[in-house]
Amino acid sequence: MAELGALNSLLRSSSIEDHEEALRIADAATKSSRSGDDITAHHTKVVALLKLDRFDDALRAIAAAGNRLEDLCLLEKAYALYKTGQLSEAEAALDIAAKSRGARHVAAQIAYRAEKFDHAATIYRELLNAADEGLVGEENDLRINLLAADAQLEWAGDGHRVPSNEKQPGREEMEAFETAYNAACGCLARGDFAKAAMLLKRSRDLCEASEDLGDEEKKTELVPIIVQQAYVSTKLGKLEEAAALQNVVVLDE
């Protein structure tokens, strides 16, 4: 039963970063349990597989452990189904799951991927309005995702579904390159190129100055920003500037 003790010790730690180790211990614990029904070990195994992006394996682990684990892991199952592109099945799993904050997050992601942008935006808006119930840093992620859903609605010609206050970038949208970029995309869809240019510049400046991204990550994030800058410059008649921006993208490839 040493592996079960190791698992309990692992779970007591405030943060588990080594997901391979968590998987190894949990897997051993499920095999060493005399009943073969240690629900904590099975649950830990599923979570570790999700953290390692092994979504098909997570689904197999849930199915193999029986109904008791499946009832406990409805949210994890829905997320794995979503990540493997099984959107209808993911929605069905969420309908059964309790409407926890985590379930709402997954529901919004499923709606976005299924191109139900109005529904996704509604969920993100509700979560944002109750941001005090969430985790530290969650509010910024919600704002990023809400603006992305809003931009998709604008591109689809459904801008009337976006509240007017979300069409006017505020201080919060200027604090992260992702929010500035998504706000810029909304402006592009509405044909407000001058405001889009300002937001894209802010997004690029923030991305280039970010201390959280490595050089390669910055290059990846900057490509769509600069491509949109080139497009905006063209729409504003600044053709030389557009050509220079296009050259930047080509040189970085």
Predicted features and spans:
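Extended alpha-helical scaffold segments
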Residues: 177, 185-192, 207
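N-terminal alpha-helical scaffolding segments that mark the starts
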Residues: 1-55
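"A position-specific structural signal for the A-helix of alpha-solenoid helical repeats
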Residues: 5-9, 44, 76, 83, ...
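Short coil/turn linking the two alpha-helices of tandem helical-hairpin repeats
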Residues: 14-15, 85, 115, 135, ...
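Core solenoid repeat modules with strong leucine/isoleucine-rich periodicity
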Residues: 194, 198-201, 208, 218-253
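Flexible helix-coil transition and linker loops at the boundaries of alpha-helical arrays
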Residues: 29-36, 68, 129-137, 165-172, ...
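Alpha-helical repeat scaffolds
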Residues: 20-29, 55-66, 87-97, 119-128, ...
